[in-house]
């Protein structure tokens, strides 16, 4: 026979010749009969009998007889009489001199006639799966003499099927007979050995290798493959035969499986009139993922059933531990086939199971803790307890889990209700003791409180009534000018200020008759419309650096830090980390707008080197308003950016964590000592550059005939260095200075970089506020402190580079006074005080 032409687009269903070729040749056995003829002949025999119930044994005998007649000598093979080669399992002949027993299903259920009703599906295994070892008997599970005699007699008479070869009864080894004959015998006599009499004889195991006994506890075996309908009784189910012969896809069976499982869940039992349940009350230990079901039969549970039906029982684990059957690796099942299983066990039977089923996937169910069910509230408490550091003792952990009191941690912090971290009283006192002099906390707190007092009137729910106007008259015109300017700032930040659902910014106060001022801000997020461009304002944090320099920072969205005034925290620095003092833990919008304007004003003023280019501060506010309104009298755009001056941009730098006690004592003190030396070194370098420039100018003027020989020399650096500040991680060194003209700092920065090997930054102080003459020249506290220290040390020791590189070593000698005794020049916070005084006089 010539094969039809096959190409890449050819399919069995489209090409008739190719389909016939596969059906006629490839699916034929040695007798010349095709596998597809077997179900058809079985149906013909069933139709001819005229009975509603199909007997698979009768159909099998007829088919075997027909195969024998045309088998060309196949009847001479003894195995055809004893073995169903399609079903793989032999049908047992009746034992002589013994009363005929009703048909016994291999699962152990007595049945008068084989049932064709489809009840449920079970995953089948392949013949390549390992066989489990036979159970080891103990004193409590011995067979009696009659049972053992019947077992030996049937063992000798049963044919063996191992792999792909047949073995005779007389020439087989005992080990080969133990694998299959013993399991078939025990499956047939399963009821007699697993009754309620207390016998613990192990039930036979499935060919997949499931153990049938563990720790003297009975284990139900996997079901043998069962036919789903009469057509499949004479063959073993496979994917190819189901698809090509029966035209049934596996998905259809899986769908039918789910329907049967729903019937079981509703308590529907198809076998109450067919099976005897007297022996189905014993409890068995089942394999993980295969729950208990009756006596030796498991229902087709999916692996995502409801977990935690019962806790694990360990009452009998210590008895007869030597009888445990070795656990073999399970093979993943691939094909569902029908089985004659009774209904699902009741809820009480499921609660008695000693083994918990496998946890479901992607299902939110209550979990268990120490064998007890845990509700949602307890689960949250357990999750909170897992985040508590291990350094806490058990008493604190118990208080945290019960939401009673606070937990004091070893690092000085306090865990509040298992959620938030804050500084303890002891740690907060340490912060105040170490940071009061270095960060000028007293002056910073006083300045901030005064600003908040002036802005408090604007936050009032009342308009300018008699009471508030009296307060303005009492304090002078400062409040009035500041409040008017605050309205300008709020008008420039409408995305943060106005409520989109209000009329022109007028918001009612709890339904009362009193209204807020025009342009007032509400923090109620529920009043905002999500479809517009209005942004909710998140309160910022106001912090102070050395000498009281103010900074606005943001906090992470999911932060658990509860900050207080006076705390020392670690923040994001310039490509590093820095240590700052918390001034205001939560800054409202008015204070944020005002501080942001002051910082931008100081920044633009510091860039102006010539004092004649500055605008008068008492006229600056009005000129800013005119520039905003587009009038003729306006600010020079080359000197001031009006938009940057008035608009608030949320800072990207954030507060990271609280500072540790070591950081605020040892590390901060070492940082202060390095800053004292850096100030001295910078002034020495500056003096050396100026002296070199002066001597060079003198030599050039004497050697040349030009009247102005200084034009050929480098100009002298006309600056005054006030202070030095290291970033906390020592990745940046900033020098603050005051100058009256434009200078070239490249030589100075080059010399400083050679010494410190870090980034050097020179920051100017505005020269229109007379800060140096008012707050520095007369006192110079930091410079005098260093000069007193120099008297006790040699200049070579102070100028040694190796000393700076080892300044954080354990052998470092501290020469500066303690942090709680130092007094510095608070010129940074003085810049803000002088600017506010001149702007709003």
Swiss-Prot record:
Record GO cellular component, one term: mitochondrion
List of residues that carry Phosphothreonine: 334
PANTHER family the record matches: PROTEIN PSP1 (PTHR43830:SF3)
Residues modified as Phosphoserine: 31, 34, 36, 237, 520
Biological source species: Saccharomyces cerevisiae (strain ATCC 204508 / S288c) (Baker's yeast)
Entry similarity comment: Belongs to the PSP1 family.
Note: Present with 259 molecules/cell in log phase SD medium.
Disulfide topology: none
This protein's UniProt keywords: Cytoplasm, Mitochondrion, Phosphoprotein
InterPro entries: PSP1-like (IPR047767), PSP1_C (IPR007557)
Protein name (record): Protein PSP1
Pfam families: PSP1 (PF04468)
Statement: the UniProt record of this protein carries the keyword Transferase: no
Location of the protein in the cell: Cytoplasm; Mitochondrion
Residues in PSP1 C-terminal domain copies: 653-765
Disordered: annotated span: 33-57, 118-147, 202-233, 290-324, 337-369, 384-405
Bias-annotated ranges (Polar residues): 118-130, 337-347, 395-405
Record's function text: DNA polymerase alpha mutation suppressor.
Coiled coil: none
Low complexity compositional bias, start-end: 305-323, 348-360, 385-394
GO molecular function: mRNA binding
Gene for this chain: PSP1
Top-rank taxon: Eukaryota
């Amino acid at each position: 026979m010539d094969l039809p032409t096959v190409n890449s687009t050819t399919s069995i269903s489209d090409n008739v010749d190719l389909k016939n070729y596969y059906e006629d040749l490839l699916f034929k056995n040695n007798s010349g009969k095709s596998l597809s003829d077997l179900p058809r002949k079985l149906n013909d025999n069933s139709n001819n009998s005229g009975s509603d119930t199909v007997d698979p044994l009768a159909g099998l005998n007829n088919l075997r007889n027909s195969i024998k007649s045309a088998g060309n000598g196949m009847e001479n093979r003894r195995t055809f009489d004893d073995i169903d080669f399609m079903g793989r399992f032999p049908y047992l002949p009746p034992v002589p001199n013994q009363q005929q027993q009703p048909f016994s299903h291999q699962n152990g259920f007595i049945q008068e006639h084989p049932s064709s009703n489809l009840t449920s599906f079970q995953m089948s295994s392949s013949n390549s799966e390992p066989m489990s070892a036979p159970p080891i008997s103990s004193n409590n599970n011995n067979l009696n003499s009659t049972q053992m005699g019947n077992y030996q007699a049937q063992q000798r008479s049963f044919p063996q099927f191992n792999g792909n070869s047949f073995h005779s009864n007389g020439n087989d080894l005992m080990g080969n007979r133990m694998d299959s004959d013993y399991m078939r015998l025990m499956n047939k006599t399963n009821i007699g050995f697993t009754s309620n009499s207390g016998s613990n004889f192990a039930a036979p195991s499935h060919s997949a290798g499931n153990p049938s006994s563990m720790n003297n506890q009975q284990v139900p075996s996997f079901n043998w493959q069962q036919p789903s309908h009469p057509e499949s009784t004479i063959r073993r189910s496979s994917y190819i035969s189901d698809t090509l012969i029966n035209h049934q896809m596996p998905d259809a069976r899986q769908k039918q499986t789910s329907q049967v499982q729903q019937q079981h869940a509703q308590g529907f039992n198809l076998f109450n009139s067919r099976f005897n349940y007297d022996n189905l009350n014993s409890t068995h230990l089942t394999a993980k993922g295969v729950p208990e079901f009756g006596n030796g039969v498991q229902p087709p549970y999916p692996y995502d059933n409801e977990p935690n039906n019962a806790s694990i029982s360990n009452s009998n684990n210590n008895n007869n531990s030597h009888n445990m059957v070795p656990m073999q690796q399970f093979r993943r099942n691939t094909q569902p086939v029908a089985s004659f299983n009774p209904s699902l066990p009741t809820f009480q039977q499921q609660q008695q199971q000693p083994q918990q089923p496998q946890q479901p996937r992607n299902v939110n169910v209550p979990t268990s803790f120490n064998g007890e069910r845990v509700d949602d509230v307890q689960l949250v408490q357990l999750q909170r307890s897992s985040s508590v550091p291990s350094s806490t003792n058990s008493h604190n952990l118990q208080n945290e889990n019960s939401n009673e009191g606070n937990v004091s941690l070893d690092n000085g912090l306090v865990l509040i209700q298992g959620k938030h971290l804050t500084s303890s009283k002891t740690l907060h006192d340490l912060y105040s003791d170490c940071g009061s002099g270095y960060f000028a906390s007293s002056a910073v707190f006083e300045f901030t409180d005064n600003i908040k007092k002036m802005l408090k009137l604007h936050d009032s729910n009342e308009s300018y009534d008699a009471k508030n106007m009296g307060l303005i008259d009492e304090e002078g015109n400062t409040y009035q000018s500041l409040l008017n300017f605050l309205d300008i700032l709020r008008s420039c930040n409408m995305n943060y200020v106005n409520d989109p659902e209000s009329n022109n910014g007028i918001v009612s106060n709890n339904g009362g008759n009193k209204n807020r001022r025009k342009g007032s801000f509400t923090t109620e997020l529920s009043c905002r419309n999500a479809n517009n461009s209005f942004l909710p304002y998140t309160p910022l944090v106001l912090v102070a650096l050395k000498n009281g320099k103010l900074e606005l920072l943001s906090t992470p969205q999911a932060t658990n830090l509860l900050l207080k005034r006076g705390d020392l925290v670690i923040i994001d620095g310039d490509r590093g980390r820095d240590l700052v003092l918390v001034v205001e833990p939560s800054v409202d919008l008015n204070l944020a707008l005002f501080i942001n304007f002051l910082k931008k004003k100081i920044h633009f003023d510091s860039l102006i080197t010539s004092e004649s280019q500055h605008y008068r501060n008492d006229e600056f506010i009005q000129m800013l308003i005119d520039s905003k309104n587009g009038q003729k009298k306006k600010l020079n755009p080359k000197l001031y950016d009006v938009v940057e001056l008035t608009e608030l941009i949320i800072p990207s730098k954030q507060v990271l964590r609280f500072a540790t006690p070591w950081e605020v004592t040892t590390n901060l003190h070492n940082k202060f000592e390095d800053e004292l030396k850096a100030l001295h070194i910078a002034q020495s370098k500056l003096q050396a550059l100026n002296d070199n420039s002066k001597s060079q100018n003198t030599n050039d003027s004497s050697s040349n005939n030009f009247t102005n020989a200084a034009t050929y020399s480098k100009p002298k650096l006309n600056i005054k260095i006030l202070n030095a500040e290291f970033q906390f991680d020592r990745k940046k060194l900033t020098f603050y200075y005051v100058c009256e003209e434009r200078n070239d700092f490249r030589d100075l920065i080059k010399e400083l970089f050679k010494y410190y090997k870090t980034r050097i930054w020179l920051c100017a102080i505005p020269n229109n506020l007379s800060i140096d003459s008012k707050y520095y020249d007369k006192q110079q506290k930091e410079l005098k402190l260093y000069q007193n220290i120099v008297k006790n040390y040699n200049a070579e020791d102070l100028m040694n580079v190796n000393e700076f590189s080892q300044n954080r070593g354990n052998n470092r000698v501290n020469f500066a006074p303690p942090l709680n005794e130092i007094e510095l020049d608070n010129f940074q916070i003085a810049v803000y005080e002088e600017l506010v005084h001149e702007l709003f006089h």
